[in-house]
């Protein structure tokens, strides 16, 4: 999709605050500082529209970005950040679970995993959760520019094995620095949302 218009419409913590215009939605999940904001910025061709932060755990709400009046990206709170209190982590979990299990507009989940490492228990739990609720998933291995391309296939194999990856889902190696994988991510989004466009 060729993106010219993007608007951060709202931050929500409850269904009563979600958008009501019935556009398809793609959720983005991952550990704190895995690169969700960087992925969003790359997809919409902006350098810093979605705020990137050196402070993990900064996203504490569901942030809805309307793209070209055709769909929403929904940035959900990052998980796995130890310095966030247990009570706050539970609150984040409830917000995420309520959205993923009850939102009719949701068309798929982009699950971001740090491509340099094996998936964490939280990464695996999120993937299993999505599969239980039959949510289509695109697994995006981030920060791949920090790994030599000759090792990408090995890392993909390690991640897929840890997740017990379902072949019906899609996997892509991504770099916000080089843009590697960007077109593949957009192709999956367009397919899930039944929209089309040039990148």
From Swiss-Prot:
Entry annotated with the keyword Repeat: no
Keyword Transmembrane: no
Assigned GO CC terms: cytosol
GO BP terms: division septum assembly
Highest rank taxon of the organism: Bacteria
Occurrences of domain EngB-type G (ranges): 22-195
Cofactor: Mg(2+)
Homology family: Belongs to the TRAFAC class TrmE-Era-EngA-EngB-Septin-like GTPase superfamily. EngB GTPase family.
Name of this chain's protein: Probable GTP-binding protein EngB
Organism of provenance: Latilactobacillus sakei subsp. sakei (strain 23K)
């Amino acid at each position: 999709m060729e993106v010219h218009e993007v608007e951060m419409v709202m931050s929500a913590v409850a269904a009563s605050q979600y958008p009501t215009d019935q556009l398809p939605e793609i959720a983005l999940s991952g550990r704190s500082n895995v690169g969700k904001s960087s992925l969003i910025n790359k997809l919409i061709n902006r350098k810093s529209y979605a705020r990137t932060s050196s402070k993990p755990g900064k996203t504490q709400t569901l942030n809805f970005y309307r793209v070209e009046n055709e769909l929403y990206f929904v940035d959900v709170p990052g998980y796995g950040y130890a310095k966030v209190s247990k009570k706050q982590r539970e609150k984040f979990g409830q917000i995420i679970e309520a959205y993923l299990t009850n939102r009719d507009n949701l068309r798929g989940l982009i699950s971001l995993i740090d491509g340099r490492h094996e998936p964490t228990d939280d990464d695996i739990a999120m993937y299993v959760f999505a599969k239980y609720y039959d949510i289509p998933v695109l697994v995006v291995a981030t920060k791949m520019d920090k790994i030599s391309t000759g090792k990408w296939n090995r890392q993909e194999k390690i991640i897929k094995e840890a997740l017990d990856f379902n072949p019906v889902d899609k996997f892509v190696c991504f770099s916000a620095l080089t843009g590697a994988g960007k077109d593949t991510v957009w192709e999956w989004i367009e397919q899930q949302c039944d929209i089309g466009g040039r990148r």
